Amino acid sequence: MSNEKIAILGPGSWGTALAQVLNDNGHQVCLWGDSQEQIDEINQKHTNTRYFKDIVIDEKIKATTDLKEALKDANAILFVVPTKVTRLVAKQVAETLDHKVIMMHASKGLEPGTHERLSTVISEEVPAELRSEIVVVSGPSHAEETIVRDITLITAASRDLEAAKYVQALFSNHYFRLYTNSDVIGVETAGALKNIIAVGAGALHGLGYGDNAKAAVITRGLAEITRLGVKLGADPLTYSGLSGVGDLIVTGTSVHSRNWRAGDALGRGEKLEDIERNMGMVIEGISTTKVAYEIAQELGVYMPITTAIYKSIYEGAGIKESILGMMSNEFRSENEWH
């Protein structure tokens, strides 16, 4: 498959990296964003230095601030915008798009307020006559590695297997490979909730704890992610795959992860507002912590790590006290599902 036209909504680090993958596969790629300065840089200098200091983007990759131009004749649309603006952008797409396309998203979060997964948000705003079933593109992937063509394996999840296979063929090449999955709930919740655990793992590092503690929070984090996901209707096997444990490992152990770095800074005593300002990028794990905590409280799901991070971020509890407080929780079996 080649020479498809793909509109990528969001010229951030991951949107730019995915644009290069698609360009390498012979597709026409148009990045859409709202910063004229950034769009001009991509078109004129073929760089995106806010995210990649020393990377040159192929000159065939185009960028625009005009949504109508980006969507014109597109075969597929990929949302890679922050969770909090996904609904707004989806509304704009619905108002602008004039033909049916394959629709994908590669963002990882849950919408604040509604608690909805992003495929649901997009489906609510874009009528069915303009789109396929949403395909979720998710898995263990640092943009910094994908942009230099390091080997990356992720998941294309959709209730429509043919749409998932289309996306699989669209992206896959010698360094980037997709596997299909029909469990959209599992893939989306895994991608969103692992950011919370990454904040916790980073906080342990910032506090000076070693590998034992980090392994514990990642492993028990996977357990509580799975508990909540299954309660929401996910297949538990999904959490042992690329979009589950794979994404949790890459996000919960690496300095490339903005959520891990945010947790590390919290552990070292920095204030959240300073962290967000210094990073200059959206830290999805912060808002997702609140959403996940609220869902867990509503459904009665035991999520001690999420609760500890929530209390630290939103109730002013010390991060060290919150995390160490889990050590005095009631004894439990490792395999409890509630």
Curated annotation (Swiss-Prot):
GO terms for molecular function: glycerol-3-phosphate dehydrogenase [NAD(P)+] activity; NAD binding. This is Glycerol-3-phosphate dehydrogenase [NAD(P)+]. PANTHER family: GLYCEROL-3-PHOSPHATE DEHYDROGENASE (PTHR11728), GLYCEROL-3-PHOSPHATE DEHYDROGENASE [NAD(+)] 2, CHLOROPLASTIC (PTHR11728:SF1). Belongs to the NAD-dependent glycerol-3-phosphate dehydrogenase family. It comes from the Bacteria. HAMAP family: NAD_Glyc3P_dehydrog. GO terms for cellular component: cytosol. Its EC number is 1.1.1.94.
